[in-house]
Every structure is written in structure tokens, then in C-alpha cells.
């Protein structure tokens, strides 16, 4: 991103054809390539771009079973379960590259969510946006 103009959206603006990537390289040496994102595939054009980057196997929110949520997003725990499931179901003996972009800590950070305690205790930290932007490591207390 350092070499792109301010405000660039690479997936939408620059990736229009097959583009070399870590995924395409690993695919070329025999890896199964998986891209996972527990949200809409149309977001940032992921459903179109991921194959251009060399990913053969895509999964988006509709593919996640037993969905658990933190705030309004599929939880990291659900996302990690999908990674494990993918790895356990890959062809025996085939290496796998599994790329996963999580959503649990995605903004907006100023909204209020039922059952979500957004309290963070730290000196000089009294901002609702910062309060929401924590790792939700205590998310199991949230009614799922």
C-alpha cells in the first residue's frame, strides 16, 4: 500500500487479471489454496479477486456452519473452526495454504451492542471508539 495513491482500493482498482501472489506461487508447487472470509464475498470484490490471486477454494459467510457472533460479525472462534475444518478435510498428503481474513473486530467502534461489554480499563483511555476496538477476549459471555 505504501506505493499506491492515498485512498486506493487495490482489490477493486488494480487486480483485473491473474496477478502473481504467495497463493499462486504455493499453488504452482502443489499446495491447495484456500481463501476464507466470514462476510460477503462481494465485499472489496473478494469473490472475483481471490481466484485472480491463485486461490482455488473460496468460502464466505454463507459457508460457515454453527455461526457464532461478536457484535454483528461472525466470531474469530467460528472463523478458526472453519480453518480447522478445512485443514482436516483437505486431500491427504497435500499441503495447504489457508488465507483467512477475520471480521470479529471490524468497525464501527462507536455502536452499542446488546450483551457486549465494551469497557477497557487503561489510563487516559476514555473514548468509545477505542473501547470497542479491543480483542473481545471475553466474548464468551455474550449470548450467542
State where each predicted segment sits.
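Solvent-exposed soluble domains appended to multi-pass membrane proteins
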Residues: 1-144
